[in-house]
Amino acid sequence: MPFLELTLPCTRATQPRFENALEDVGALAVTMLDAHAGTINERAILEPGVGEVRLWEETELTALFDGDSDPLMLLAALEAFDPSLDTRHATFRSVEDSAWERAWIDQFKPMRFGARTFIVPWNQDLPEEANTPDAAVVRLDPGLAFGSGTHQTTALCLRWLDALAGEGQLQGCSVLDFGCGSGILALAALKLGAANAVGVDYDPQALLATAENAERNAMEAQMQVYLPQDEPVQTYPVVLANILATALDALAETLAARVAPGGRIALSGIMQGQEQDLVQRYTPWFEHLHCEYDAEWVRIDGVRRH
């Protein structure tokens, strides 16, 4: 079934009102893009602060509605919800569901990380190499695009977990995945032998994605999810944080306090050029800090001082 796509230009100041109005009138999804994307005025927003949402000064909002929605009635409903909204520059077009949904699903293929860790879309067959008793297979819903293993930051963490399991460091332990997204790292740790895992994220939708993927992998009893303010304060033998450098810097004391003495930590989401400042930041709490590189991305791992 096709969808009706509505595109609206707005500013940083008016974006929240537009987004609320779109959701109120039945938008199935709302996305935000730089209004100058693809031009010399395009501006990247790579590093929001912890719990912060940053927007462009001029933003393009795109909303999807059921294909049988009436454009004129939608505009009237938006203006009725908030008469101050300027909808004069709204545009509509019909979008086939396969044009966006299938494109993402089709590019998500089974992937291997390290010796025995596999990430496989739930709707695809296991590759032959994953049909072994010791394979650690995580099934993910490719529609939950909070982390699928395709990005280097996630791949760096998955390879680290696989190596850790090979050393016997994961067996029977508890794992904290801070910034859990889809839950891919926590679930991989469980598949590799961890006894239980906790996923923490600022985004409630990420917690929902993690819980759904845990259920899909029959691991809901071993997986707990929390918003940061609700997380029980405890220590873990293994902690992962695949977020961004600014957040890793701001959360250094918090993350260090979560790692048990002698425990292991992996930090990812770091771009080349940012790693040395973070190594220095974490040195008071960790030793044997090591940087692993994949293209322009870096993972830092280390051992908690006693």
UniProtKB/Swiss-Prot annotation:
PANTHER family xref list: ELECTRON TRANSFER FLAVOPROTEIN BETA SUBUNIT LYSINE METHYLTRANSFERASE (PTHR43648:SF1)
Origin superkingdom: Bacteria
Alphabetized InterPro entries for the sequence: Ribosomal_L11_MeTrfase_PrmA, Ribosomal_PrmA_MeTrfase, SAM-dependent_MTases_sf
CC terms in the record's Gene Ontology section: cytosol
Catalytic activity: L-lysyl-[protein] + 3 S-adenosyl-L-methionine = N(6),N(6),N(6)-trimethyl-L-lysyl-[protein] + 3 S-adenosyl-L-homocysteine + 3 H(+)
Coiled-coil segments on the chain, per record: none
One GO process term, biological-process aspect: methylation
Function of the molecule: Methylates ribosomal protein L11.
Family: Belongs to the methyltransferase superfamily. PrmA family.
EC id: 2.1.1.-
Binding site residues for S-adenosyl-L-methionine: 154, 179, 201, 242
Keywords associated with the record: Cytoplasm, Methyltransferase, S-adenosyl-L-methionine, Transferase
TM helices/strands, residue ranges: none
Organism listed in the record: Xanthomonas campestris pv. campestris (strain ATCC 33913 / DSM 3586 / NCPPB 528 / LMG 568 / P 25)
Pfam family, one: PrmA
Record's protein name: Ribosomal protein L11 methyltransferase
Gene Ontology terms for molecular function: protein-lysine N-methyltransferase activity
Annotated compartments: Cytoplasm
